[in-house]
Amino acid sequence: MLKTRIAVFVSGGGTNFEALINAQENGKIPHGEIVLMVSSSKTAYALKRAENHGIKSVVCSKKELGSQERFEEEILKNLEENNIQLIVLAGFMSILSKEFTKKYENRIINIHPSLIPSFCGEGFYGLHVHEAALKKGVKVTGATVHIVNEIPDGGPIIMQKAVYIEENDTPEILQKRVMEQAEWKILPESVELMCSGKVKIENGRTYCNE
């Protein structure tokens, strides 16, 4: 069976990347294979995770390359050299242009640490999301996996999972619970759905064929 060739994009520690690797090694992504990790930072711990698991990694730094255009050209070169069919944004802090997302239309997915459309879009990333949820006083938060388009966090939703907020939560505690109870579960599941061709996109919505 030919497996879908996956690239995972990261910017930091790579905990979601590690969750994907573990899922792959445990046979939970039978239709896909992670063949490349792209980091936007040369100091990201995710690079060590890739090395530990024998996964090829490259660093594409917008700061070092000097412009969005050169940044995306370098990424595209690596994607094409490795015949990438699916891109997974797993804590990737750089915004991709409309031209880039169009080139890989319906082949880029992202994990976001809230129940979209709450606490998403420009400025909502990392701990900021959980700080906003606690400040608003919502009782339930969670995570969302969605198709990436030109609108930040605006593409069709593939999967969501809710997580209850507890009375003494801090942004850090909530972030950890959302990762453990939601992100690390629905991201590998969504990747497998994409790789197996079960996700159908129609009129801005997704439908999963079992």
Walk through the language-model features, giving the residues of each.
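One-carbon transfer enzymes
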Residues: M1-E210
